[in-house]
Amino acid sequence: MNKNAIQKFAIWARNELIAQVSQRAYQYGIDESGFGDASADTLNGRLLTAEEKSQRQELIKQIKEKGYQQVMEEVAYTWFNRFIALRFMEVNNYLPSHIRVFSDASGAFKPEILNDVLHLDLPGLDSGKVAEYIESNDTEALYRYLLLTQCNALNSALPVMFERMGGYTEMLLPNNILRQDSVLGHMVSDIPEENWQDAVQIIGWLYQYYNTELKDDTFAQLKKNVKITKERIPAATQLFTPDWIVRYMVENSLGRLWLEGHPNAELHDGWKYYLDEAEQEPEVETQLAKLREEYKTIKPEEIKVIDPCMGSGHILVYAFDVLMQIYTSAGWDQREAAQSILKNNLYGLDIDDRAAQLAYFAVMMKARQYDRRLLTRGIQPHIHSIIESNSLGGAYKLAMGDFLLSKEHQETLNYLLDAFIDAKEYGSILCLEKRDYVGLLRAWNLTASQTTESLNLTLWFAAVEHEIPKLIEQAIILTQGYDVVVTNPPYMAVSNAGGKVNDYVKKNFPDSKADLFAVFIERCGQMAKKNGYQAMITQHAWMFLSSFEKLRTKLLAVDIVNMAHLGARAFEEIGGEVVQTTSFVIRKSHIADYKGEYCRLIEPTSQQGKEDMFLAGENRYAADQSNFSKIPGSPVAYWVSDKVFSIFSENNELRSICAVKVGLQSGDNNRFYKFWPEVCFSAINRGERNALRNPKWFPCIRGGVFKKWYGNQDSIINWENDGAQIKTCKSAVIRNTQFYFYENISWSEISSGGISFRYNYEGSIFDQKGPCCICKNHSDLIYLCGLLNSKPTQTILNILCPTLDYSVGPVSTLPIVMTQEFKVVELSQNNIELAKTDWDSYETSWDFKRHPLV
């Protein structure tokens, strides 16, 4: 697949479509500055048709509600989605007419539909209009008409992708679409046709690349402290999951669910990312055997699978393939299986309308691959964009009488109308009460229209008749249990979201409130049935950071079946070390002493390298997760040996031997910090606290580059009058002043490599980037400096701090073996002196005398 061509086209197409759609709006007197008379009958001397007038008024109404830019964006992506859907269908010969809309048989941008127009059998086609366009030689107008008619014709088969035309979206179809340099021309000529052939993944790549500039702009605004709105959350968080990781997640959750109860060597061998169970103790095997007996009773049509953050549907499409293999292994015909999968198995939700459209389309095209008549059967999948109830009003405001023939249904309806206000802010993390939503849907369809007793209720029903069933089905999807929950959730600090999301998460998910990916870990666990499976790819921070310790406690109460610990660069589109990920499969059960299978893939520096290591079976560990609690904070340290676990359980922590403290935050570094050569040297108090009368400048330990034993002493801080000026700074945080000016050991809180510990003489302050250990006994401090700089300590810190963050919390829990071995102190002291001599041999040291070679 030529991703460079796809990316280049998608980014260009978005800007071009927005410009072209805006130009069409301008032709109707509408631009960013205003829209004139909404009820105008003429524009620029031209009389508007009744249809144009209605479309224009509808457009103006939308602009009033959402804003001009948002509406132009929405119309642009609506046409983009339709164009790529039609292109996919024509290349794969899925169009009911079997006549190409954009190209000819050779693949050139010469629409076949124009050449065959006189023989075209297309529902809704007006042959009279066609004849008029041909007679007037208006090829552009003819093609616009044919394109709109084709979209309308697909409405009955694919109503979510091809909504019935006639609204302002039709009015804003760009001009000059037959030109070679149009969006259609570039789509046909720039993306190789083979990229569209039976490769529905192209839909996901187009969606991701289409959002590139919007995503960049969103993060640029975030740096200016502009929160991410619900309209921009999809662009900010959408990330196309690598195909092999999708296969790993689906095969080890959905595939495992089936194989555990229905062993099948052919299926097992065909799923190359499937991991066999780790070797278990006999007692564990007995418990697993009981689970397998339960799984034996499951039938293919009973399996429920959901992706609650489905994006463009990549995971659902592969789940469809695996379900098809399960069905056929159970004796089903492919055609009937495809229909059953749509009706019974697959569910998907997303807050982004355009992503939901594409996911819906991708799943339908996958079903069409197995059933040639699928598009004529009227079957629709359970794939939905979250909808809000804001514009639906509240039935409870009206006299309801015997509406729905049930007070319970009335109360449930009103509950949903309240619960789904601003639902796109929250998406699938919305937690609803368990109620009879299925009964409510049945009652709505059977009795609602006959039980509206008052005029107001009748008018309200007429306005919401078709929207309420969507709301109810949404509630059903959010509350029913699933055998398999599999997703790649959004990665976004909750603090970057709007206040509504922030407040909701703090109230409902206090143990995972730091990031949306963690919230979804917890939420997906709620959606899974007992003994069901949960498969995800998330940032790996939840495995180690103290802010997720309570979440880890919850996760360690269920069985981690296996994990592919990916680390950095698991996504080829993301470079650097910041985004580090892990993919894992959880079974919602708890078997004591169960061992999960863990694949440590953090060393390869490319997406392909990680996949190759996984398939090679390298770096595999079988770990009993109950051991994790032996380490402070219970990190998911699956690679740790029993010997190392015993080191933690048998020795004291660093914080029990010395004070381990974090320092101050000045609140304004440019104002309060300097490098020592920037001030008069004699004005720096480097010794006893009162060596100078009313001193202003003091040495300050601030972390720095990797340097063991001694060094990184080049910063000073304004601490005049005990930091009086700093204390007036609103954003300053003053901590642990009672430990200032003592000799200590410091390290850099953030490090891209290993950690290094340095000895500091008396007389320094320390800040948050240079935390310190302070001991009462000088010999103990020197001994600790040696121990902390040893290789065993680095090995243990790799367990406690596998991210870039060596904060005080995990470092203070280091297990420490104290001995009276004088040799350790002597060697450590020698190393400190050698390191100081080296540091002082450069002019950047305030103790520099002369270069050693002079």
Q: Residue spans of the language-model regions?
A:
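Terminal accessory regions of large proteins
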Residues: 76, 829, 838-854
